[in-house]
UniProtKB/Swiss-Prot annotation:
GO MF: argininosuccinate lyase activity
Catalytic activity as recorded in UniProt: 2-(N(omega)-L-arginino)succinate = fumarate + L-arginine
Pathway(s) the chain acts in: Amino-acid biosynthesis; L-arginine biosynthesis; L-arginine from L-ornithine and carbamoyl phosphate: step 3/3
Main location: cytoplasm
Membership in a protein family: Belongs to the lyase 1 family. Argininosuccinate lyase subfamily.
Keywords: Amino-acid biosynthesis, Arginine biosynthesis, Cytoplasm, Lyase
GO term, biological process aspect, one: L-arginine biosynthetic process
Highest taxon in the source lineage: Bacteria
Species annotation: Maridesulfovibrio salexigens (strain ATCC 14822 / DSM 2638 / NCIMB 8403 / VKM B-1763)
Protein name: Argininosuccinate lyase
Claim: Amino-acid biosynthesis is one of the keywords in the record: yes
Cited Pfam families: ASL_C2 (PF14698), Lyase_1 (PF00206)
Length: 460
């Protein structure tokens, strides 16, 4: 048997060292050791229940695998690159511990269904961690909204001042985005929660296996329907990574806003010292490095996703060695997404706001212009005409470096005789927000309802 490989019976020549270095995966797939051992223990128990192994043999295997787990977690386990992957490393060490019965563990199983099971279990564990982290993040944004219902700031389109909104409404927009991300994570969990054990290499096996038993021992909800599909697709990984990419997209958007808001020209937020860095030459600097890095890491997560999609796009059924390239992109995506969600929640909890600067910004950019147009519509003027009248008033005020609310009634009447004293109630920024009564708007009733709904959801 060449190289003493577990698969070496068919080979006479030794594997070239360069090939071993090029093809090994143990340097990174050892991250799946918990899942691999759990999957092997479930497989052994199932084999015993089906009469393929004796109960005594299964018990020996399970206890031997427990010892392997202890050795790995204590740092005593020696990973050997020449063994190719974690499966061979673990099985080889198991056989050293328990003797010839170790060779029976792989009965009715291929590394193809073995690694598919390992990876599904790993992705599921990661998604559960994302789900928990997102819940804390949603709670952080909801808490900020709850504490800032009365604070107003400009709402923007094209990054130009548009209409006044409450800071609570702004925070809630992100809470809803992350809640949708949470629901996508749950959907990913539901679809990934399928046990491939029993599919073997690609066509199933002649042994009387019972995949449902293996799934039960692993706590997985369902079993595969088609053995080719079970071992050859990584859609559950790509779907998780796409969801991670969307999470990072939403994080990157709030990061962009926080970077802008931290600029003294805006001054809307007080960057927590714990989440800022300084300059080696400019003593006054307080840089939003965490936000900038998170914005930058978003592209990295996109790259992880596209890397795996490109790997899988041309693969014929069933398993191909290309699929070894599925793990490192996901490991990187998982680490980046989870860390980003956690640190954003912590940063938002520590974030301070500058309501006075937000209020000052309301007076720049004619954010009450739409209110004047709506006021004129209420006086019976068609909206397009009201839009033109308001635009003319804005042009005059802008030329004189004034706000609409600074113009006298007589001046406003030169644009329309429909304008009366009550117009000044409409031009108030606070009134503009209070007058928003449509569902989902920035109006107080809508904001209160949103906060209540999110709080109720978080308690479930």
């Amino acid at each position: 048997m060449a190289d003493n490989k577990l698969w070496g019976g068919r080979f006479a020549a030794k594997t070239a060292q360069s090939v071993e270095d090029y093809t090994e995966s143990v340097s990174y797939d050892q991250n799946l050791y918990r899942e691999d051992i759990s999957g092997s223990q479930a497989h052994a128990k199932m084999l015993a229940e089906q009469g393929v192994l004796t109960a005594e043999e299964a018990e020996i295997l399970v206890k031997g695998l427990d010892q392997v787990l202890e050795e790995i977690e204590s740092g005593k386990f020696e990973w050997k690159k020449e063994m190719e992957d974690l499966h061979m490393n673990i099985e080889s060490r198991l056989t050293e511990i328990v003797g010839p019965v170790g060779g029976k563990l792989h009965t009715g199983r291929s590394r193809n269904d073995q690694v598919a099971t390992d990876f599904r279990l790993h992705v599921l564990r990661s998604l559960e961690a994302w789900k928990t982290a997102l819940e804390k993040l949603i709670a952080s944004f909801t808490a900020k909204a709850d504490a800032n219902r009365e604070v107003l700031l400009p709402g923007y389109t094209h990054l130009q001042p548009a209409q006044p909104v409450s800071l609570a409404h702004h925070m809630l927009a992100y809470a809803w985005m992350f809640k949708r991300d949470h629901s996508r994570v749950v959907d990913c969990i539901n679809r990934a929660n399928v046990c491939p054990l029993g599919a073997a290499a690609l066509a199933g096996t002649t042994y009387p296996l019972k995949p449902a038993t293996s799934a039960k021992y692993l706590g997985m909800e369902d079993t595969f329907r088609n053995s080719l599909d079970a071992v050859s697709d990584r859609d559950f990984v790509m779907e998780a990574m796409f969801t991670g990419s969307l999470i990072m997209t939403h994080l990157s958007r709030i990061c962009e806003e926080l970077i802008i808001w931290a600029n003294p020209c805006f001054g809307f937020i007080k960057l927590p010292d714990e989440f800022s860095t300084g300059s080696s030459i400019m003593p006054q600097k307080k840089n939003p490095d965490v936000c900038e890095l998170m914005r930058g890491k978003t592209g990295r997560v996109y790259g992880d996703l596209f890397s795996l999609m490109t790997t899988c796009k041309g693969l014929p059924l069933a398993y191909n060695r290309d699929m070894q390239e599925d793990k490192e992109p996901f490991f990187d995506c998982d680490k980046t997404v989870h860390a980003s969600v956690v640190i954003m929640a912590d940063m938002m909890d520590a974030m301070g706001f500058n309501p006075a600067n937000m209020e000052s910004a309301l007076k720049k950019g004619f954010l009450n212009a739409t209110e004047l147009a709506d006021y004129l519509v209420g006086k019976g003027i068609p909206f397009r005409e009201a839009h033109h009248i308001t635009g003319s008033a804005v042009a005059k005020a802008e030329a004189e470096s004034r706000g609409l609310e600074d113009m006298s009634l007589e001046e406003l009447k030169t644009f329309s005789d429909k304008i009366e004293e009550d117009v000044f109630e409409v031009l108030s920024y606070e009134a503009a927000v209070r007058r928003r009564v449509s569902p989902g708007s920035t109006g107080p009733e809508s904001v209160d309802s949103q906060i209540a709904e999110l709080k109720a959801w978080l308690k479930k």
